[in-house]
């Protein structure tokens, strides 16, 4: 490892956004590097994961209840991290150890070891533990296989098809013998989905005739729809769902910055009638709370698929902790291409 710097930076939540987050919602603070006490380790963040769920953690406590409490004003922004042990007063950790944790948006963290996962002595791609081999990959795996239950010959439609979850869902779908239709934003992403990820078709949701294109791409209807987006994408999908279709609901990123209900007529009666008449299974899930007990199964199978080249993975590395706020703002607008990871420090 390189010599540790003499400063400790951390991004805290300065204010709660109304609509889209702005740079003013975050504040960068500096202090001395902390010293571990008895039973503690000092972790230096190397990679920080940025994910859409972070927008929900910026909400007010008085907002609609969610599965995790909001970040307090003045507290460090949350986030999964890959770190290295700098110094240790803990019997299970030695300087130089690689660990997966939840240190958040900061250079250093003191930890008692609770919740840390060792990544081995010399992991080949340590940041992948935040992506295809971590929470996004696990989310794709369990959501599709346990809730979606794809069968060979079925049509699988995937929203946000080039994001870390959607890209993995589509590739697992191909492994299971599905016809896969991706939905993404822009020609470049759609081309990548087909040429690299192996989707049979990928449609640009920004097209004026997107709904018509989707209907043409799914002449036999939709058997499984993996929901990451919501909004007008779901509106186009709903009438195409087949009887006994399955809809794993992973995210609704199109509405994360919304300040109220969408314009237009109330869509709930149509949704409920469609679910009833077509016996559709639509289920939300929280990966850690619902499937944490199956992490070993996922790690074994996904590791094998990645090693065999059956699952391809794209990472968007951004250098510098100072870039985190703008990177998250861009992520929520769909400006990312692949899994967004902040490289906080050198990984040597």
Please tell me what each predicted stretch does.
Residues 75-87, 91-160, 202:
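NAD(P)H dinucleotide-binding glycine-rich loop of Rossmann-like/cofactor-binding domains
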Residues 232-311, 344-348:
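Glycine-rich phosphate-binding loop and adjacent beta-alpha segment
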Residues 32-50, 58-105:
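Glycine-rich beta-strand-centered segment in the early N-terminal region that forms part
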Residues 130-208:
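Mid-domain Rossmann-like dinucleotide-binding core that forms the NAD(H)/NADP(H) cofactor-binding site
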Residues 107, 185-193, 210, 267-272:
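Short, glycine/polar-rich helix-capping loops at beta-to-alpha or helix-loop-helix junctions
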Residues 3, 15-46:
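A short N-terminal beta-strand-loop micro-motif at the entrance of redox/enzyme domains
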Residues 2-6, 289-348:
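C-terminal hydrophobic helical "lid"/dimerization subdomain
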Residues 209-219:
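Short amphipathic alpha-helix with an adjacent loop that forms part of the alpha/beta core around
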């Amino acid at each position: 490892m390189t010599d540790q710097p003499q400063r400790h930076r951390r991004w805290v939540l300065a204010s709660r956004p109304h609509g889209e987050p702005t740079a003013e919602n975050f504040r960068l603070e500096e202090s001395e590097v902390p010293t571990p006490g008895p039973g503690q380790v000092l972790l230096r963040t190397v990679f920080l994961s940025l994910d859409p769920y972070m927008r929900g953690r910026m909400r007010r406590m008085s907002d609609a209840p969610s599965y995790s409490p909001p970040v307090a004003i003045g507290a460090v922004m949350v986030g999964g991290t890959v770190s290295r042990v700098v110094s240790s007063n803990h019997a299970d950790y030695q300087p130089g150890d690689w660990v997966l944790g939840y240190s958040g948006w900061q250079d250093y963290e003191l930890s008692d070891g609770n919740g840390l996962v060792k990544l081995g002595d010399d992991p080949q791609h340590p940041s992948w533990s935040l992506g295809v081999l971590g929470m996004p990959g696990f989310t794709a795996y369990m959501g599709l296989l346990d809730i979606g239950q794809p069968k060979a010959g079925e049509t699988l439609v995937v929203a946000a098809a080039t994001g870390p979850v959607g890209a993995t869902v589509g590739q697992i779908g191909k492994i299971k013998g599905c016809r896969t239709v991706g939905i993404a934003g822009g020609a470049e992403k759609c081309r990548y989905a087909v040429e690299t990820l192996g989707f049979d078709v990928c449609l640009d949701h920004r097209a004026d005739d997107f709904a018509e294109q989707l209907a043409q791409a799914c002449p036999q209807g939709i058997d499984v729809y993996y929901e990451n987006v919501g909004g007008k994408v779901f509106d186009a999908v709903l009438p195409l769902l087949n009887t006994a279709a399955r809809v794993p609901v992973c995210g609704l990123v199109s509405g994360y910055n919304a300040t109220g209900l969408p314009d237009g007529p109330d869509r709930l009666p149509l949704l409920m009638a469609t679910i009833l008449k077509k016996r559709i299974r639509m289920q939300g899930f929280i990966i850690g709370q619902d499937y944490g007990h199956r992490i070993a199964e996922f790690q074994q199978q996904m590791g094998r698929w990645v090693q065999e080249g059956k699952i391809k993975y794209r990472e968007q590395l951004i250098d510098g902790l100072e870039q985190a706020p703008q990177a998250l703002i861009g992520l929520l607008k769909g400006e990312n291409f692949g899994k967004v990871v902040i490289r906080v420090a050198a990984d040597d």
